[in-house]
């Protein structure tokens, strides 16, 4: 015999209504948001945005060249051995 507990069925809470305490909740976002040291949002109107220096570029072409030369040397070595 199969027994299953029956829980009372009720209506789900209404969707799309603000919480009882209003929105946003008290203390959200905290005072001084964003914290010091983080981006402060958009610059004031009439002032240019801050300039950031570019990160140094890595030598991607050298890595590819080194890989191709290593493969070529490996092929030559295998050709000489067999």
From Swiss-Prot:
MF-aspect GO terms: protein homodimerization activity
UniProt keyword annotation of Chaperone present: no
Domain of life: Eukaryota
Keyword annotations from UniProtKB, A to Z: Cell membrane, Membrane, Transmembrane, Transmembrane helix
Compositionally biased spans, kind Pro residues: 26-37
Location of this chain's protein in the cell: Cell membrane
Primary role: Required for the promotion of megasporogenesis, or promotion of germ cell formation from somatic precursor cells. Acts redundantly with WIH2. Functions in a genetic pathway downstream of SPL/NZZ and WUS and together with TRN2 in promoting megasporogenesis. Involved in resistance to abiotic stress.
Name this protein carries in UniProt: Protein CYSTEINE-RICH TRANSMEMBRANE MODULE 13
GN (gene name): WIH1
């Amino acid at each position: 015999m199969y027994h299953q507990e029956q829980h009372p069925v009720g209506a789900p809470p209404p969707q799309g209504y603000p919480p009882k305490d209003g929105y946003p909740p008290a203390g959200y976002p905290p005072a001084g948001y964003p914290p010091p040291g983080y981006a402060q949002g958009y610059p004031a109107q009439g002032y240019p945005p801050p300039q950031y220096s570019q990160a140094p570029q890595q030598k991607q072409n050298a890595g590819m060249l080194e890989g191709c030369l290593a493969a070529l040397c490996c092929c030559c070595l295998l050709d000489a051995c067999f």
